[in-house]
């Protein structure tokens, strides 16, 4: 099951926004070169981010749907436009390394020219003067002081990142049409990720959009694995991890 807050965001096919789309390069061709056919949750995320009406996209997605992978793909697509700056935020240093490694793999796959690859600071600079920077919530001060075209919060619900975004990072989205993507499996209903997610369903926040996708949207999951998970996990645990349900834990 997939639930999208805004009716003009589709999940069954990639949408075209010829005039003001956020991702300037052809997405379909890029995905074809990677051999990727996006699942419905990934398609919804792409369409929501690409839609010029929305600046803030929240995606509550069950486990193993390729959310970190598609987030990194979107980050690199934006970086292919000269002088673009992308920030990939993670809860901690270890998780930021996953995105750093993914970016290196994508760069190698497309044989992009890199003029700086700083493993210590986790910054990659391409020959077109675009930068892809990794950051962690517990060291957010190290990534302020610059403007970003796209900020991606991966596994956002795993840590309290509200202050990191509102105080440190929201002011860095000062470019016209700069955007933020928050993506995670839920971790209860009384936290910042849930608050941001429900903004997408409110007319009070017209620039926000949200998506929730359960395990049914993952074509790679087997029915036998789902049956085993249901037997070995509590109902609340299963609903959170596989149904992307906010309401099972506080």
Question: Predicted segments — roles?
Answer:
Residues 2-250:
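Phosphate/NTP-binding elements of NTP-utilizing enzymes
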């Amino acid at each position: 099951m997939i639930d999208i807050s805004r009716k003009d965001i589709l999940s069954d096919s990639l949408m075209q926004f010829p005039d003001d789309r956020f991702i300037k390069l052809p997405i379909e061709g890029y995905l074809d070169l990677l051999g990727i056919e996006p699942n419905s949750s990934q398609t919804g995320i792409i369409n929501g981010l690409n839609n010029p009406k929305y600046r803030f996209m929240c995606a509550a997605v069950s486990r193993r749907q390729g959310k970190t992978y598609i987030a990194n793909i979107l980050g690199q697509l934006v970086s292919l436009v000269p002088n673009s700056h992308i920030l990939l935020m993670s809860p901690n240093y270890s998780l930021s390394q996953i995105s750093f490694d993914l970016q290196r793999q994508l760069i190698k796959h497309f044989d992009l020219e890199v003029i700086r690859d700083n493993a210590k600071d986790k910054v990659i600079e391409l020959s077109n003067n675009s930068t892809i920077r990794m950051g962690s919530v517990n060291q957010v001060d190290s990534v302020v002081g610059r403007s970003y075209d796209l900020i991606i919060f991966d596994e956002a619900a795993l840590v309290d990142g509200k202050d990191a975004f509102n105080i440190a990072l929201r002011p860095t989205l000062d470019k016209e049409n700069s955007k933020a993507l928050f993506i995670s499996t839920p971790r209860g209903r009384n936290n910042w990720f849930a608050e941001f997610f429900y903004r997408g369903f409110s007319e009070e926040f017209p620039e926000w959009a949200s998506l929730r996708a359960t395990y049914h949207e993952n074509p790679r999951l087997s029915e036998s694995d789902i049956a085993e998970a249901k037997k070995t996990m509590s109902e609340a645990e299963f609903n959170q991890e596989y149904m992307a349900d906010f309401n099972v834990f506080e």
